[in-house]
């Protein structure tokens, strides 16, 4: 699983990077917010990001907002690091889109556990997405034959007719009927 570590303090960044690498993650690093933004807004963003709040270029909170504004990409779990420790700061970070918040200084074990929590949440999200796709497919097809059901066919037909109208082309539709379908239905359900 890929994790981005973005921190402008070189000692902190290298310590976090080496710890995360030791825990079995693939690590990408960014020395400032601008570099982190390029990585996070790229076509294949990392699964998780550990972002420092105060960085040159784009700060961690603004970066959270920009990442969350993209609805079309896979979800990135964001852990925000900061020396800011007040309740208002934590709330501001979470409201900006961070999934978790760690106040500096922190123990490496705390980071390890929070990353493990993020990994668990991302795995659950993947399972939920797969289940949704399965349910969507089951709802669109006849269970016995595996063929598209009436509503799905009408929906596809509507899309194809709209596309043909936009492109100025025509569509052909074939209607097929199965003789003695009642016997098939009575036999197989």
Describe each PLM feature range.
Residues 7, 52, 82:
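Active-site residues of response regulator receiver
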Residues 29-48:
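Acidic, metal-coordinating helix/loop segments flanking the phosphotransfer/catalytic sites
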Residues 136-155, 176-189:
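Conserved nucleotide-binding and Mg2+-coordinating catalytic segments in signaling enzymes
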Residues 55:
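Receiver (REC) domain active-site loop signature in two-component systems and cognate sites
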Residues 14-22:
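Charged docking surfaces used in two-component/phosphorelay signaling
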Residues 104:
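A Lys-centered signature of the CheY-like receiver
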């Amino acid at each position: 699983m890929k994790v981005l570590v973005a921190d402008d303090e070189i000692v902190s960044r290298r310590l976090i990077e080496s710890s995360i690498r030791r825990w079995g993650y693939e690590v990408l690093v960014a020395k400032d917010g601008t570099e982190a933004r390029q990585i996070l807004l790229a076509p294949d963003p990392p699964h998780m990001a550990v972002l420092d709040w105060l960085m040159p270029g784009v700060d961690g909170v603004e970066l959270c907002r920009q990442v969350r504004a993209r609805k079309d990409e896979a979800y990135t779990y964001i852990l925000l690091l900061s020396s800011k420790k007040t309740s208002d700061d934590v709330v501001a970070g979470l409201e900006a889109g961070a999934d978790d918040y760690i106040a500096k200084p922190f123990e490496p074990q705390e980071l390890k556990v929070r990353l493990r929590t993020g990994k668990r949440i991302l795995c659950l999200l993947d399972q939920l997405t797969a289940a949704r796709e399965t349910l969507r497919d089951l709802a669109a097809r006849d269970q016995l034959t595996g063929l598209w059901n009436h509503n799905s066919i009408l929906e596809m037909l509507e899309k194809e007719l709209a596309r043909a109208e936009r492109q100025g082309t025509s569509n052909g539709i074939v209607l097929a009927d199965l003789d003695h379908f009642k016997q098939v239905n009575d036999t197989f359900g």
